[in-house]
Amino acid sequence: MPEVRSTCPYCGVGCGVIIEARGGEIVGVRGDPQHPANRGLLCTKGSTLHLTARPLVAQQVRALAPELRTARGARRQPIDWDTALDHVAERIATCVQKHGPDAIGLYVSGQLLTEDYYVFNKLAKGLLGTNNIDTNSRLCMSSAATAYKQTLGADIVPTCYEDIDCADLFFFAGSNAAYAHPVLFRRVEEARRRNPAAKTIVVDPRRTDTVSGADLHLQIVPGTDVALFHGLLHLLLWEGWVDRRFIEAHTEGFAELKALVREFTPALVTQLCGIRTEDLVLAAQWWGQARAVLSLYCQGLNQSASGTAKNAALINLHLATVQIGRPGAGPFSLTGQPNAMGGREVGAMANLLSAHRDLANAEHRAEVARLWGVERVPEAPGKTAVEMFEAARRGEIKILWIACTNPAQSMPNQRLVREALAAAELVIVQDAYRTTATAALADVLLPAASWGEKDGTVSNSERRISRVRRAMAPPGQAREDWRIVVDIARRLQRRLRPGRPSLFPYASAEDIWLEHRDTTRGRDLDITGLSWEMLERDGPQQWPFPDGASSGRSRPFEDHVFATVSGKARFAAVPYRPPAEPIDARFPLRLATGRLRDQWHGGSRTGTLGRLFGHAPEPCIELHPAELARRQLRPGDLVHVTSRRGSLVLPAAASDAVRMGEAFIAMHWGAEFVAGCGDERPTFGVNALTIDALDPDSRQPELKHAAVRVQKAELPWRYVVFGQVPASRQLELQLALRAHFGAFGYACCVPFGHDDARAGLVFRGAAATPVQVCVLQAIEQVFGLEDAAALDDARRGLRSRLRAEGGHVVAIALAGPVEALAAEVWLRELLGRPLPLPAHRLLRPGAQPPAPTVPPGRIVCNCFDVAEAEIRRVLATANGNALAHLQAELKCGTNCGACLPELRRMLPA
């Protein structure tokens, strides 16, 4: 069977994959044992990639042809590529000539390949003459990049994955790596197994799976990271655990920082952070006495109005103790997306230029103009992500071109985003998926190729450039992103710079990469020593890799010469500031958002597989059990979650992972899966609640903290439909069901199940009064329930349906007051099984299960479809090594390992 080596399209670990292809289709995927990022391992998401690339998925969710609508509110119609490209180029050129280039905004993505990114950036800044290009990496990595520049002089990650094998203290801050970077977390676990003396500290307001294996959990009050890091430095100074010779020889700005942290006494820090003094002192002791400290951090630091300060304050600790530039030591920013780093490398952000050049630097602008063959690169700063949508709402930006990202799900303050998209004169969406919330709002939809269909490169968290290779042709008329951009750019050239040499002479991704490579000469990320052939022959390579080098550099700054003008690292005396939105009597809870283990971003890809919902089947808001009790709520009660920007209705879930006064909602639950009109207005998923306050330096929004209130939702009438549907129609039917969300105060629809032939769907709704029968009939028709066995009681508001095929239960609908749906738990267990009793006996009020049942609970191990109840059954009889017994009998935890932290928590004490 033909095999193709490529790279996983999910997180920034950058795992190598081997794709198995047959008959023009991707039929399998496994980890590449030769790739240094993962050494053969894959997580649950990566190991199911081939299932997301099946034709039966593509035909339901992929954008397969260009589409255009001529008026808002009209349905888009398929058109040919030439018509689509001509239309886009004509509208952009006319807008530029009428309103100027800054009337255009391009919003791109860390999921694009480096070559895609490069041509987008060149089109914006070189051809159109606007710096209004930004990326969704602004939402995840810009604070990390800004802090690296402020302290080390350049956006250079000073560490590598090999450092995990060498560290003796792992310091996780704002990172649930067990979920967000699971393969990397497995490597940490393996390093600790080999070195039992190594310790782990986790700084996180929540008790996550990453915390479960930690030696010390600093469960700080959300947003107090800077105070914590200053407090640690205060203690390191007090105990003499800093290296004054290094500070004197290789850094600057220490006096100002020392004066600042003098005030951050243990008493003050423990009060601000809500932690114990002895834990603060112990953390400082472990750091100060460690041989090699590796800090690993992510969105918990970055997604904050103080994100740059949080990053810089952590880097201060490394500089003060010389925990940088040597094996096992350094501040390691874990990239959220597969090519967020590649976007920074090519300068595809509103404040950057090619090869880490600064837009504000006149010499850098002149260099790029010469390299590109244009008269000038514009000087005016571009609009960053949130600012771009604000400008569109004000009418300053007339055309938005959105590529490979879903801002109508992922951006904060969704009301702003929706108003911006409505105000723009033209919204162009270039995406592989037609099912995203943003695609639904597009005037022009350009179908793009996706994973397994593209050719190019990406750069992962450790600065390693990997090849992405094509294993099959894109479905329908979809095209590679760079080809779409180049085709539009060539049309624009004829209007905007007629008669001049083409800026876009490329015939392949390699052509683009070679030009990008040439722009890096003499820069901190110099890759002029690399060739396309070398990447093909020798595999992934790290930068910098200048001309004449025999290999890339694993650890920059080993010589303690930093990328500043003086060659010295800069301490950052950053003040502590509380979150942008304080809690108060009206909004007394601190809301955080974050990841689920088996989902990724808005779920346009992972959301196509029911099996990836097994671990977290439906949306909810997590609250501490005592918080629920204080509010007279029970698990499962529907609640209004309201911020100053919007509202959302969700079921409440009890979780001791959060503290009193705090709440958590997974970031993946957008309007594609959960909505309604609980407050008599449409809701737009979790980011209807989040705040668009920006970090003053990085312009990254504060997605990790919003003040909210929670009140019981008075929606006494409930409705649920669940059933098996043909896998070839599951996602198409889910999209059809989404159209009915607005009829309910609360509604959600998610897939479930592992069966590849018969997939599962569940639709759940709630309302103040019974929803119109015609709506229910339309929903039930999707499940084939129109001629099913029925039991109705109009007086009591009850409605039940059950459909069987060949004597097996296929679909069930239940409606009525909350108590009428109590049978759902055991009725769900009948799906796909022989009908045990006549349907009317199963549906009648007060019916009991025909046989004793134990609800399976959540799926803990997705690889082998192992549920909680089964694990507890086996553990009840386990002797000796309970984990080994579990793995031998159920296989859970023996494949990707993502479930291991949870399995260990379930073991008997």
Regions found by a protein language model. Give the residues of each.
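N-terminal export/assembly segments and adjacent metallocofactor-ligating motifs
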Residues: 1-239, 249, 257, 268, ...
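Immediate flanking context of iron-sulfur cluster ligation sites
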Residues: 1-6, 24-41, 847-858, 876-895
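Local cysteine-cluster metal-coordination motifs and their immediate loop/turn environment
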Residues: 5-17, 39-49, 857-870, 888-905
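N-terminal leader/propeptide and maturation segments of large enzyme subunits in energy/redox metabolism
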Residues: 71-77, 239-277, 354-355, 359-366, ...
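Extended redox/cofactor-interaction regions of prokaryotic respiratory oxidoreductases
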Residues: 118-189, 196-201, 226-230, 318-441, ...
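Long, contiguous, secondary-structure-rich segments that constitute the structural scaffold
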Residues: 475-477, 481-538, 602, 606-622, ...
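C-terminal accessory/binding modules appended to enzymatic or scaffolding proteins
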Residues: 584-606, 848-885
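C-terminal catalytic lobe of FAD-dependent flavoproteins
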Residues: 747-842
